[in-house]
Amino acid sequence: GRVDVLFNNAATDDETGCDTIATITQNVIDDTFAVNVRGSLLMTREFIKHRGDYGRIINISTDASQIFAGQITYGASKATLEALTRSIALEVAPYGITVNCVSPGPTQTGWIDDEFEKVVVPLIPMGKLIQPEDIAETVLFLASEQARMITGQVIKVSGGKAL
């Protein structure tokens, strides 16, 4: 059979979760871009090679792509993934393939402790953390026939935090 949907959801950040221009290392740059950009790009290339006349490619980014201090490599890698989403969308549109990106805000997947939640929730206009099902429902929509004319878009699922 064939694969109709590719979901690129790999991500890594450096071991401390933050880097600055003064502290960044080549290893952190290489490792972050290898997973967050090169991995998705190579998976997409293989998907395109084996495509028919239909397909959905959905990338996962983050609101950190809007650039936050102390997240240089992570934010830049996800901003690059968003740019690739738009470029690839133009290239493969004639083949009936859509390419979109979902950009979540702070999502409660177990890594947000009570202390961090108290800091971040006030920054979200809708007043609560994003849940994994919020992301999943957006991805399912983009993979569906209802989204057949949506391509090259970055869909922000952030409760209004990233506009």
Feature map (PLM): residue ranges:
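Catalytic Tyr-X3-Lys loop
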Residues: 4, 22-41, 58, 81
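Catalytic loop of short-chain dehydrogenase/reductase
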Residues: 12-13, 58-80, 85-94, 106
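Conserved mid-core segment of classical short-chain dehydrogenase/reductases
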Residues: 12-30, 70-73, 111-114
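Short C-terminal tail/terminal secondary-structure segment
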Residues: 18, 139-140, 151-163
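A short, exposed helix-loop element centered on a Lys and neighboring polar residues
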Residues: 44-45, 86
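Alpha-helical segment proximal to the catalytic Tyr-Lys
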Residues: 49, 90-91, 148
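Short, small/polar-rich loop/turn modules that mediate ligand/substrate recognition or access, typified
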Residues: 93, 98, 150-152
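A conserved structural motif in NAD(P)-dependent oxidoreductases
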Residues: 124-135, 146
